[in-house]
Structure formats: structure tokens, C-alpha cells
A protein has these predicted regions:
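Post-HExxH zinc-binding segment in Zn-dependent metallohydrolases
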Residues: 75-98
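A short, highly charged nucleic-acid-interacting micro-segment common to nuclease
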Residues: 1-8, 86
Length: 98
């Protein structure tokens, strides 16, 4: 299996956001605890810079909250389907995300 470079993951996140008119705010890596979020009403996500595959799939999950199915349902349904969207659109995945 070909290893996906960090830059390719970062570019993929940016391309998805651009294609879906999503603005991105980045949480500094100096902040110890990640604070990811998505705001559908303003099409904006907060993510950490794409430092590794875990950060990448988390970014895709937040994008999934904007463009994924069933984001007007219960919190559990929204979370599940944001992960489904992330998995379906990822160029690489991490076993810990399963």
C-alpha cells in the first residue's frame, strides 16, 4: 500500500472545503486539547493542522457535519453519519478511527 504524505492529506482537506464553500479556522498545535467543531449555518469548521492521519480523519469528520447526510437528526445520528461521510471520502484511513 502506498503511503499518503501529510501534504496530500492537507491539500485534500483544502480541496474539499473549497469545493463545498467551507471556511476553515485552525486551532494552534500549541493548545494541548483538540477542539474540533463544525457550524453548518455559516459553513465553517475548526480543525487542527493536518499533522497526521488522525488529524486528517477528524477534519473530514467535521466536513461531514457540513455536507454529510442526516445532519438535521439526533446528535448520535449526526455523529455517525459525519464519520460515514469521512470514511467514504478519505484518501487514507487509520485503524484507530474505525
Amino acid at each position: 500500500m502506498k503511503k499518503v504524505k501529510r501534504i496530500d492529506m492537507a491539500i485534500h482537506v483544502q480541496e474539499l472545503c473549497a469545493a463545498n464553500y467551507i471556511s476553515v479556522a485552525y486551532q494552534p498545535l500549541s493548545q494541548k486539547h483538540p477542539k474540533y467543531w463544525a457550524r453548518r449555518d455559516v459553513r465553517k469548521i475548526m480543525i487542527r493542522p493536518t499533522k497526521n492521519t488522525g488529524y486528517y480523519v477528524s477534519a473530514l469528520h467535521e466536513i461531514g457535519h457540513i455536507v454529510g447526510k442526516f445532519q438535521d437528526r439526533s446528535q448520535l445520528t449526526k455523529e455517525l453519519w459525519a464519520w460515514v461521510w469521512a470514511r467514504q471520502n478519505a484518501i487514507v484511513w487509520t485503524e484507530t478511527a474505525d
